[in-house]
Each structure stands twice: as C-alpha cells, then as structure tokens.
Regions:
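Acidic, proline/glycine-rich low-complexity IDRs
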Residues: 91-129
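Short, mixed-charge, low-aromatic patches
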Residues: 10-15, 56-58, 105
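Short acidic, gly/pro-rich beta-turn/loop elements at beta-sheet edges
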Residues: 14-16, 52-54, 115
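Short, extreme N-terminal segment that most often corresponds to the first beta-strand
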Residues: 1-19
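Short, intrinsically disordered low-complexity segments
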Residues: 20-91
Length: 129
C-alpha cells in the first residue's frame, strides 16, 4: 500500500482527486501564500500495483512549480509535473535522488524554504496516520 499527499491548489483540475481513495482531508491556513490563504490537503491510499499509473495521472494534472509526495515503507516519490524522483527513506536527504529533486525544484522556481522535503514529508506522514 502506498500513501500520497496532494494539495488541490497544485492541480489544474482538482476533480481528479475523486478517482482516488481518500483517507483524510486537512485544510491548512497559509497567510503568506500567494496562491490562496487556505489549502486543501488530501491524503490518499493507493494500491501498490497502481502506484506508477497514479503518479503519472497526478503529474499530468499538476501545475508548474508544485510537487506531491507518494510513499510506502521504503520509498518516497517526489513527483513534479514533468519529473519524479524515487528516494530511499532510510537515506532521505543523503540520497542522490533527494538532492536532484531539490535542484529540479529550484530550476522550476520553487523557493528553497519549500524544498526541505524531509521537513514536509515527516509532517505529512505523521498527519496521515
């Protein structure tokens, strides 16, 4: 079983979330957000055999400059609209893919404060349980 966290602000058409098994929705207040002060964060469950298709489905709908997390017990996928990085959770920020995801994020205009994937992933992983 895989899990995912998606901010619907990141999607061109957020109705795509309706095709997923939703385990939880959290509304976060982000007063400094340039997009929206309120973000709807969806926590999803995905069957292991569907993970690649579901990542691709979300990536196609994702706006530029956003990313989503998909994970199981071993790996964390950091998915952007045009590229996905597979990170070993045991190594996290020491994993080459983690560093490449940060570099890629910078190249598409994401601010460094949002590229601390470890911080955000651990927070969302805890909320999803």
């Amino acid at each position: 079983m895989y899990f995912a966290v998606i901010d619907t602000e990141s999607l061109k058409d957020p109705r795509i979330i309706n095709s997923f098994q939703i385990s939880k929705v959290v509304v976060e207040y982000e007063p400094n957000s340039e997009v929206n002060k309120y973000h709807h964060i969806f926590f999803l469950k995905i069957k292991s055999y569907e993970i690649e298709n579901k990542i691709n489905l979300i990536a196609k709908e994702m706006k530029d400059g956003w990313f989503a997390f998909f994970w199981d017990n071993q790996f964390l996928f950091i998915a952007f609209n045009k590229q996905t990085f597979k990170v070993n959770q045991a190594m996290l920020e020491k994993d080459k893919q983690y560093l490449q995801a940060q570099d890629y994020g910078r190249s598409v205009g994401i601010q460094d404060e949002f590229l601390n994937f470890k911080k955000y992933f651990k927070r969302y992983k805890k909320i999803s349980i």
